[in-house]
C-alpha cells in the first residue's frame, strides 16, 4: 500500500466520489493514470448500478479503499480496456449485511500486472470449439499442445468445448493450463450470482 493516510468512515461521510478520488490523486499520477478520466469511469459505473450507488453511500470507506486499490495497482477502470471493475457485495460486519464496494481485477488486468511485475513474459489464451483439432500431450515431462483453430466456425459460444492458457515464464519455459467447458460454465454462473 502507499503512504496515503488511512481515512475513516467518519472523515468520508458526506464526501462525493470527486472528493474521494481527489484523496488518491497522487497515486493515480504515480501509476500513469489520468485522475479525471478514472473519475469519469468510476462515476459512470456507480451511477449505472443501483447496488454500487447504495454501497458507495452506505459504506464510503469501501469505495475509498477500492479506488485506492485500483489506483495503486495501476489498472484502469476504463470499460474498454477491461482491466478492473467495482463489484457490490454484502459483507457481514458485526453480524449485519453491509453494502460494500470491492475492486476486482479482470483477466486483462491480472495479465498486465503479472507482465509488468516481470513474473511472466506473456500469457496467451485460446478457446477450443467443437470440430477443431486439439491435442494435449505430456511426454517425458514435456507438456505440448497442438491446436488448429477453425476461424470460420467460431461464432457460436455454445460450441465452445474448452480453453487453455500458455503462460511463458521469464525463463522462457511455457506452462500450460487446460480447462473444459464445465469450468467456464461454473465461472460464468458464479459471476452472475455476485
Short names for language-model regions:
Residues 1-28:
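Glycine- and charge-rich intrinsically disordered segments
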Residues 18-194:
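Binding-interface segments
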Amino acid at each position: 500500500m502507499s503512504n496515503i493516510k488511512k481515512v475513516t468512515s467518519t472523515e468520508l461521510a458526506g464526501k462525493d466520489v470527486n472528493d474521494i478520488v481527489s484523496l488518491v490523486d497522487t497515486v493515480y499520477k504515480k501509476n500513469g493514470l489520468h485522475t479525471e478520466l478514472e473519475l469519469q469511469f468510476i462515476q459512470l459505473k456507480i451511477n449505472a448500478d443501483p447496488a454500487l450507488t447504495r454501497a458507495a453511500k452506505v459504506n464510503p470507506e469501501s469505495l475509498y479503499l477500492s479506488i485506492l486499490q485500483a489506483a495503486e495497482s495501476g489498472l484502469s477502470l476504463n470499460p474498454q480496456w477491461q482491466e478492473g471493475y467495482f463489484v457490490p457485495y454484502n459483507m457481514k460486519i458485526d453480524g449485519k449485511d453491509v453494502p460494500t464496494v470491492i475492486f476486482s481485477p479482470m483477466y486483462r488486468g491480472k495479465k498486465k500486472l503479472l507482465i509488468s511485475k516481470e513474473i511472466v513474459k506473456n500469457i496467451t489464451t485460446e478457446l477450443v470449439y467443437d470440430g477443431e483439432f486439439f491435442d494435449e500431450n505430456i511426454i517425458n515431462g514435456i507438456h505440448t499442445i497442438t491446436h488448429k483453430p477453425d476461424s470460420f466456425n467460431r461464432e457460436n459460444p455454445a460450441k465452445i468445448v474448452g480453453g487453455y492458457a500458455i503462460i511463458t515464464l521469464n525463463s522462457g519455459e511455457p506452462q500450460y493450463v487446460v480447462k473444459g467447458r464445465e469450468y467456464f460454465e461454473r465461472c460464468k454462473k458464479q459471476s452472475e450470482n455476485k
